[in-house]
């Protein structure tokens, strides 16, 4: 074949034609590729030998010119060796291709790349020597640049994979801790709860909430017995009472005067004292008595600090109680409150008893009845008084009005009242402090507006049948000679007038103090003088306990009080603290546990058969504990933005719910709907104190499942009984209780690490130093901060645009050209904008051990 080729040197065959056309393209090639991209017809896929011969016949003149151009190259000129350059670029492409195959793991290519795509001839020629290129010939091409990046990325990837394998092997035996699991458990009786009240009509319970949305969800979970909200009834009642009167102490001043108090010897020896007397606006106190203190306002009690309420009746979880009528003063009638029959088990004296210490009567068939009774009162007054000049309206002239004098001793006042039904007060309890003796009843009476009187509401007390012996206790009944009892008739007959009086004060015990509220001035403000009438206005939900009375069959009789009537109600049975406690007994205080130790089997558990899905309802009030529990203001303000928060966190809820994979946890009590109020209840507050400790233990505030390294787990001698899981046949209470000790120990470990962590102390010190350095920023006005920040932001954006725009444009251009199948290069600069008539190809270097003629 070699002899035939030498015999006909003028004819150019397909093989030589293919190389000459490659040279023609390479003469205009730079680092970025050919200037005018062309297609070598001899390299078209699927071309046959016949087609190659036809191309040789057609392109023979062009091929002859290309051969002559190559042969006329002069050695002494410094033109770039285009042909050598093209061969180097071809080899560099193969290097990049080799790196790509190494990156994807296709190592067979590295061994067979020299055999792929090469045409082999069995000819008798000398073996070519290895070619050498200097750095100037090589330059820095795009292939070299991206090849280096590819190599660096490959090494980094394998390093990361190797590190991940090592980390996984080290943490395979780690203990799993579930932070803030979606379940609730009862609180301890020793825990402190933070609460606040809310009532839309009451300023003392409305100044920080605005509108309340009761977050509730139905659930069927079983919670073991724990403390209820009734355990804190006395503390809640005392706080509500202070709230009711706090507004009045900050109100307007009704009267002010100065008085001089003298001592026993007059003003001698500086025993005189000048006292400034300030009487506040009694209108405020009277409003409190008319509305809140007497329970005419519905009040909801809401917990803060991450605690929740579990209603044992409705099986619901919520932050707030249902609206309750909470009278803060003793009353004859009140909200539903039952009494207890077994008096031996009653430890709290405030709880009403259904028996009595000195009576043989037995009350059974007790039931709650609404107060379908009305009281009518008519006030009459003798007429001593005086004429008063008043202006009735701007249309009329001044006129004289008769105003009776109610302060005169000559004035005779009567306030008879009657009931619409018989009321028998069957027993007596220790009600008000300084209680009225005898048979008595009290109620609220409403006076309509008239020409001479304004609309008002008074508290009226009626008393009759007072016992004559004050050393004995007035007792309802007519059995004589009862030890320590003064028998009185406690029946208030219908349509019978009884002498009553306006209650101008009441006495309450707040904390350990007995406080007397004198309402005389407040009553005077409503113009009680004259003749007027009123009708009781008991709330519709109020009533009394009506019982049947049966005398005991005990043979020992005559020394105990028998039934005063066959039916009766319990007089003064409503005690505010006891009533509040009974209303709150149905609300169990629960919380979301901070940690739950989870066996590894739980995370890997696969149910054998399809089970019912566990629906987790997530109501988002995430800042309840952050808002400052117990401070009062804005403690539950997040509830008003519930809908906005729900829309914002909906995507996060779905991701977290999917990540928990609760369907794999076959807890008996968790196969129903469970409510989690807040994804991170108190998480932010706890993280502030346990950040460094949790970091050392392998957790952060954004993780719900944390794998504590086994080394740390064994260092603190913590073990978990893997058998408690029992393949999922465990209740919520059992799981929590069996790991409760470990949870407490885990919390103590966190506190111990936090207090003794050197890194934590160092971090705090560095934070303080940084704060000292940047403290001057706080002295800059706000508008200057905004202006400076805007200028820096714009400048940084322009700088990044200048630096990154060329690279971005080149990247986009290269991607487009790669998709099209070729690469466009830039035209080489030519001085004088004139193209040389003849572009000669020169070698910038020489081939190792080979002359120029031999190379050609």
Curated annotation (Swiss-Prot):
Residues 1-785 are extracellular. The keyword Phosphoprotein does not apply. Signal peptide: none annotated. Residues 662-680 are annotated as: Immunosuppression. It comes from the Viruses. Residues 643-693, 736-772 form a coiled coil. Specific enzymatic cleavages in vivo yield mature proteins. Envelope glycoproteins are synthesized as an inactive precursor that is N-glycosylated and processed likely by host cell furin or by a furin-like protease in the Golgi to yield the mature SU and TM proteins. The cleavage site between SU and TM requires the minimal sequence [KR]-X-[KR]-R. It holds the Pfam family Env-gp36. InterPro entries: Envelope_glycop_lentivirus, GP41-like. Residues 616-636 are annotated as: Fusion peptide. Keywords: Cleavage on pair of basic residues, Coiled coil, Disulfide bond, Glycoprotein, Host cell membrane, Host membrane, Host-virus interaction, Membrane, Transmembrane, Transmembrane helix, Viral attachment to host cell, Viral envelope protein, Virion, Virus entry into host cell. The surface protein (SU) attaches the virus to the host cell by binding to its receptor. This interaction triggers the refolding of the transmembrane protein (TM) and is thought to activate its fusogenic potential by unmasking its fusion peptide. Fusion occurs at the host cell plasma membrane. The transmembrane protein (TM) acts as a class I viral fusion protein. Under the current model, the protein has at least 3 conformational states: pre-fusion native state, pre-hairpin intermediate state, and post-fusion hairpin state. During viral and target cell membrane fusion, the coiled coil regions (heptad repeats) assume a trimer-of-hairpins structure, positioning the fusion peptide in close proximity to the C-terminal region of the ectodomain. The formation of this structure appears to drive apposition and subsequent fusion of viral and target cell membranes. This is Envelope glycoprotein gp150.
